[in-house]
A protein has these predicted regions:
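Residues in well-ordered beta-strands of folded domains
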Residues: 138, 163, 176
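Catalytic domains of carbohydrate-active enzymes that cleave complex glycans
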Residues: 1-148, 152-154
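Surface-exposed beta-strand/loop patches in extracellular or lumenal glycoproteins
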Residues: 153-168
Length: 184
């Protein structure tokens, strides 16, 4: 969260000593619903361009596998292992938190979610992205966040308010944007 050069250098030092490939994405889902921080950091550093597609694909695999486990589960009652439903839970938020909010996954047992951005749907008057709107946080720097917003609706306009920080703890000093429409 500090975004200092010294902290970034610490990350690079750790990466240099790591025996694992920091670009790898694996379709796994533990109790933390996390584990891809290194690959996400490499994406933010501009060194893992296809990370968004790969983490979304891995997440889809996790969801499909967990839904199959739930469908195949014939047990009833309360005599399950203490982690029975945790193992079969198809909800996975890691990719969406990283890619749309610009944040690492929160700690699974109650940690606060510290994000760079949050969204407010002005038409529905509720937090979150409007229907048919995609967001990708492409870069995070100490004084700059780059997010790409795309309206995927073929015929409806969408409006949203882009806010700084999950709790309003950040401020936008300036904003720049560009827009374009599809040519097809």
């Amino acid at each position: 969260l500090s975004m200092t050069d010294a902290d970034w250098q610490r990350i690079e030092t750790i990466r240099g000593k790591s025996a694992t490939d920091w670009k790898e994405v694996h379709p796994f889902h533990g109790k933390t619903d996390a584990g891809h921080e290194a690959a996400w950091i490499r994406f933010l550093a501009g060194d893992n361009d296809d990370y968004p597609e790969r983490i979304l694909h891995a997440t889809e695999q996790i969801v499909r596998r967990r839904l199959a486990l739930t469908r195949e589960d014939t047990s009833v009652g309360t005599r399950h292992h203490v982690h029975h439903w945790q193992w079969a839970n198809p909800v996975s938020s890691e990719a969406l938190v990283q890619l749309t909010l610009g944040a690492p996954q929160q700690i699974y047992n109650g940690g606060l979610l510290h994000t760079r951005l949050r969204y407010f749907d002005t038409q529905r008057r509720c937090p979150g992205l409007p229907a048919d709107v995609a967001a990708l946080v492409e870069k995070i720097e100490a004084e700059r966040t780059v997010v790409r917003l795309v309206n995927l609706s073929g015929n409806e306009t969408r409006e949203l308010i882009l806010q700084a920080g999950a709790f309003g703890e950040h401020r936008f000093g300036t904003a720049a944007w560009s827009s374009r429409t599809s040519v097809w």
